[in-house]
Each structure stands twice: as structure tokens, then as C-alpha cells.
Amino acid sequence: MGLLAGYFGGKTDALISYLITTRLAMPVVMVALASASLIGGSLKVVIILLGCLLWDRFAVVVRAAVQQIRDAEYVASAQALGCSTLRILASEILPNLVGALIVVATLEMAHAILLESALSFLGVGVQPPIPSWGLMIAEGKPYMFFSPWVIAIPGVALMVLVLGINLVGDGLRDLILPDGRN
């Protein structure tokens, strides 16, 4: 969606930007919590919810990157050669977005892990046969005062994983997109 909005501009950009802004206005945790409690919690439901709720940041980044790239000389030369719009998008613009998409994907991965853990902690995420750190923390609540390691170990593991993914994302951003360096 961001690819189309950034390339075509005009009414297409306005419509897609409106959809993105509408989606960004909804609180992710509340929508996921309401949807998961209505549909029921399972691994398949959580994966579909994460996909439906976390696409917007990809679209925003792609739209902004395409708006910068669409006026480049190599895109204009492809248009002058008579290449179709689909070919220009697929062979000229999309390969130049891979770096930005990798960075957003690593940072959104941490967001998805935290959202899944929150849903599982609240009881509407994945169900007990499937391991989840949120579920482990929820099941350890009764033992919090007598055996604090039951919730501390999955909590610390979750924190280390999310921190590690964020650090990798920051490192990739500095490596792939040098424009944003301080």
C-alpha cells in the first residue's frame, strides 16, 4: 500500500494515507485484546492479528522512501524507455527499499513479541500447550512471593530478547541507512 501511495501520489496517496492514519489512531493492544477475546485465543489467531495490526509502520516507511526515490533519474529513464508501472515498481523502486524494510522488520519484530506476550499474559493469546513467555509469567503469578524466579526468568528472557532485537535493529539502521546517523 505504501508503494502505491508513494509512487502515484494524488488521490491514491490521500486515500491510502487516510487508511494508514485511521489504523495508527487505533490502540494496538486494545484492538488485539478485543479481537482475540471475540475470536478466541490460538496461535493462528494471534499470528493473523499481529499481521493485521502491525502493517501500518511498513506502509509509512515505504511511502516516504518511494516519495524520495520516484523522482530519481533511473526511474525517469525507465519511464522514458516505456517500462510498465509494475516493472518500474518491481525492478527499479522495490530493490531500493529493502534496506529500510529490513530495519523496520527488526524493530517491529520486538513489538510483535511484546504484543503476543501481553495477549498470552491476559489469557487471550496462545493457549497452554504452546509455550509463551507471557503465559509463563501469568502462570507464575500465584508463586510470585514464594518462588519469584518462576516469573523472573521468563520476564528477564523476554526483556533480553526484545532489547537484543532492538539493538540489532538500531545497528542495522546505522549500517544500512547512514543518513540517520548522528
What are these regions (language model features)?
Residues 2, 6-10, 81-83, 129, ...:
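A short glycine-centered flexible hinge/capping loop motif at secondary-structure junctions
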Residues 3-4, 34, 47, 51, ...:
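A residue-level signal for alpha-helical anchor/packing sites in multi-pass solute transporters
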Residues 26, 86-118, 165:
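Transmembrane alpha-helices
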Residues 24, 35-39, 50, 65-66, ...:
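Glycine-rich helix-loop "coupling/hinge" segments at transmembrane-helix boundaries
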Residues 9-17, 67-71, 76-103:
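Amphipathic cytosolic juxtamembrane alpha-helices at the membrane-cytosol interface
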Residues 1-59, 64-68, 102:
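Generic hydrophobic transmembrane alpha-helix motif, especially the helices
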Residues 167-182:
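Short cytosolic juxtamembrane segments of multi-pass membrane proteins
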